[in-house]
Amino acid sequence: MLVLINTIQEQASEAIKQATDIVALEQIRVDFLGKKGKLTELLKGLANLSAEEKPKVGQLVNQAKQGISALIETKMIELKEKQLLAKLAAEQIDVTLPGRNHSTGSLHPVTQVKHRINDYFSRLGFDIVEGPEVETEFYNFEALNIPGHHPARAMHDTFYFGDGRLLRTHTSPVQIRTMEQRKPPFRLIAPGRVYRCDSDVTHTPMFHQVEGLLIDKQATLAGLKGLLQDFFAYFFGRELALRFRPSYFPFTEPSAEVDIECTQCNGKGCRSCKFTGWLEVLGCGMVHPNVLIAVNIDPNEYHGWAFGMGMDRLAMLYYGIDDLRMLFENDLTFLRQF
């Protein structure tokens, strides 16, 4: 019996030495110490021994069992250390490798233009006001002296909702709401999104517009002209020639459209300006008396001027973009240029 116990110990010791992973070592534990293991079978055979042999053999088997368990625990620690070292080696980070730079974001070109416009007018004491994009016909049309038969009120030019509301076609409703709430004199600009049923190279169903308004007893068209000349010199960084052309808008009288000297060819004529040397940039005029009456301002005491221009159009001119739709396609390769 002693020889058998020693043989089992030697077999277990050799098997433990040869084990290369935790799974194999666990199998050795089962083979020698499990319910059907070799040492367990010896313990079951004690019943066949004499009363004198049972204690001695039982003690030897337990000693062998303890010895094998100790060898397994020692080997288990060794294998776990090797496993950890192998994992660390596989996941090792080479700190000498160059880092991966994360590109920083930037403001959209239209947002940058909006900030430039806001900065200029806020320095001159203009308030920057905003209003709802979903409007009523009163604020979008009626209060602005736009009659019911006017083409702008047709379904093919304006986005209407079923309940009579609509998506504003300009930021002029912001001016009406402000004039209702404030007493003159005041000056403001109203930047924001506007919507019209139009889509091509130079038009989109949604675009950005900024409108300016000044109500005062001494408001003149000459003052508006001087302001616009100074603004475009600031915006483009150089003096530009301006041309005022008579025009018609229901909410201003007299009305004018303003062209600036082409920023691409300096007025000599090119494809950008259709070889005219001029670029149309905004509409303006003196506020129509009917608009003042609609908001309970006496047109005999106060006068005003207003202008409106597209911020997307200015962004195209400032950055040399030839297709308006590029501003709305979310192409990061394009937007990262700004």
Curated annotation (Swiss-Prot):
Q: What EC class does the entry list?
A: ligase
Q: How is the cofactor bound?
A: Binds 2 magnesium ions per tetramer.
Q: What are its E.C. numbers?
A: 6.1.1.20
Q: Binding residues for Mg(2+), per the UniProt record?
A: E253
Instruction: Write one Pfam family the protein is assigned to.
Output: tRNA-synt_2d
* Catalyzed reactions per annotation: tRNA(Phe) + L-phenylalanine + ATP = L-phenylalanyl-tRNA(Phe) + AMP + diphosphate + H(+)
* PANTHER family, alphabetized: PHENYLALANINE--TRNA LIGASE, MITOCHONDRIAL (PTHR11538:SF41), PHENYLALANYL-TRNA SYNTHETASE (PTHR11538)
Q: Which family does it belong to?
A: Belongs to the class-II aminoacyl-tRNA synthetase family. Phe-tRNA synthetase alpha subunit type 1 subfamily.
By what name is this protein known?
Answer: Phenylalanine--tRNA ligase alpha subunit
State the organism of origin.
Legionella pneumophila (strain Corby)
